[in-house]
């Protein structure tokens, strides 16, 4: 099972005059932050809850703008990229970003937010024997642009960001440089992240997450068969349906929200929650998504012996222009001439012109790779506890050690790439 995500953020100049940096050769400058285990004032559980709050707020906007379509994204990738930008933001621009990420600045100092992210990303970067998680950021900077040393050092130390120089006066070459980097970091699952660069581009920030996990209890490929997946009460498609017999797995029936929740664990420190709303109840479940709901589901899970569990095998991908979505969460100024990103270069002449998020989700028998009444006889939970994920459902992948939501997906059409 794989989940692969990449995000690209393009920063352009409002006016000329911020240029002057020594040489134009490609340079790579990497510094990994060695976080001491003395912790941070923003503990991991609080940060996880805040990130989940942002994740569900963003999910609701995506669902509203993309009805009846697959949704796949990594809230952690998006919030980490925005947090890096906030290192160079000031005034109202800074407040918009951090408050848009659901931080209360009267309760949590900005420095603690960055230390919290740094601690989280450092823990995620520890290689695991069973679950593979790779996350990182990179700054591609116009070869003549002078970046403030403080911004670059903080991006390195807290967010493990790599720094490269690029010649944006040659947009095609710069685009290839960035897209090749992202492709290599995501096992070649994400290609063409950035497009339409022009000579006004001064900096591109990319953030990526690659996740690959093996099911603790894998499906047998010999049991996979063609079966119906219901798009709505009138339409269905044939999909490869995976099947597993006689398993005991964490299970919860939420009568209040009319949905069934099952947890399938990966080997190692990750798990996936699958949420199957009753027919016609998806909007009710979506409206209730918040950190408290996720906590309730996880705390209510109990081992349940199941006769059979059926889950579609699929590979889907999505891409979003976050420039059209984040303003609805209060993050507006970075895309306008009012932006104050002077902590990056020392001058107020930068704006974010593009923010693109791409995600790929593969679910198969061995695991995950990552790069929603009438007229239809839906097969639902029965007395013998057989569960069919044969209609629209939600999926939430979490890192169990730091209790952080890594990815969220809504599967409406398993065959639509």
Swiss-Prot record:
Localization annotation: Secreted
Annotated region (RCL), positions in chain: 367-392
Signal peptide, first to last residue: 1-22
GO molecular function, one term: serine-type endopeptidase inhibitor activity
Disulphide bridges: none
Cellular component terms (Gene Ontology): extracellular space
Main localization category: secreted
Positions bearing the site annotation: Reactive bond: 381-382
GO BP of this protein: response to cytokine; response to peptide hormone
Stated family: Belongs to the serpin family.
PANTHER family xref list: SERINE PROTEASE INHIBITOR A3A-RELATED, SERINE PROTEASE INHIBITOR, SERPIN
Note: The single human alpha1-antichymotrypsin gene (SERPINA3) is represented by a cluster of 14 individual murine paralogs.
Entry text on domains: The reactive center loop (RCL) extends out from the body of the protein and directs binding to the target protease. The protease cleaves the serpin at the reactive site within the RCL, establishing a covalent linkage between the serpin reactive site and the protease. The resulting inactive serpin-protease complex is highly stable. Variability within the reactive center loop (RCL) sequences of Serpina3 paralogs may determine target protease specificity.
Protein name: Serine protease inhibitor A3C
Record organism: Mus musculus (Mouse)
């Amino acid at each position: 099972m794989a989940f692969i995500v990449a995000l690209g953020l393009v920063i352009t100049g409002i006016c000329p005059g911020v240029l002057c940096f020594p040489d134009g050769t490609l340079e790579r400058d990497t510094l990994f932050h060695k976080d001491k285990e003395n912790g941070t004032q923003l503990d991991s559980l609080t940060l996880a809850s805040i990130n989940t709050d942002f994740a569900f707020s963003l999910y609701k906007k995506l669902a509203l703008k993309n009805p009846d379509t697959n949704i796949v994204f990594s809230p952690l990738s998006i919030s980490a990229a925005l947090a890096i930008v906030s290192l160079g933001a000031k005034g109202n621009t800074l407040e918009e970003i951090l408050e848009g990420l659901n931080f209360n600045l009267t309760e949590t100092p900005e420095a603690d937010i960055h230390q919290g992210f740094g601690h989280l990303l450092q823990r995620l970067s520890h290689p695991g024997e069973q679950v593979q998680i790779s996350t990182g950021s990179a700054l591609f900077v116009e070869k003549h642009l002078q970046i403030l040393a403080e911004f670059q050092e903080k991006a390195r130390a807290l967010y493990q960001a790599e720094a490269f120089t690029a010649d944006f006066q040659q947009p095609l070459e710069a685009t290839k440089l960035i897209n090749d980097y992202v492709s290599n970091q995501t096992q070649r699952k994400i290609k063409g992240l950035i497009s339409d660069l022009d000579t006004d581009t001064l900096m591109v920030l990319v953030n990526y997450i690659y996740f690959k996990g093996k099911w603790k209890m894998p499906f047998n490929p010999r049991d996979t068969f063609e079966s119906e997946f219901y798009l709505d009460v009138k339409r269905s498609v044939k999909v490869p349906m995976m099947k597993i017999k006689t398993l005991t797995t964490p299970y919860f029936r939420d009568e209040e929200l009319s949905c069934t929740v099952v947890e399938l664990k990966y080997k190692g420190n990750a798990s996936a929650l699958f949420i199957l709303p009753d027919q016609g109840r998806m909007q009710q479940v979506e409206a209730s998504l918040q950190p408290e709901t996720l906590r309730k589901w996880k705390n209510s899970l109990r081992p349940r012996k199941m006769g059979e569990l059926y889950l579609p095998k699929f590979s889907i991908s999505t891409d979003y222009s976050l420039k059209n979505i984040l303003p609805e969460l209060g993050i507006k100024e970075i895309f306008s001439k009012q932006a104050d990103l002077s902590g990056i270069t020392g001058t107020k002449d930068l704006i974010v012109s593009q923010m693109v998020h791409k995600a790929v989700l593969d679910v198969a028998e061995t695991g995950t790779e990552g790069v929603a009444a009438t007229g239809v006889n839906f097969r639902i939970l029965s007395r013998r506890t057989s569960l069919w994920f044969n209609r629209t459902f939600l999926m939430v992948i979490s890192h169990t050690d730091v209790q952080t939501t890594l990815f969220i997906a809504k599967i409406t059409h398993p065959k639509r790439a």
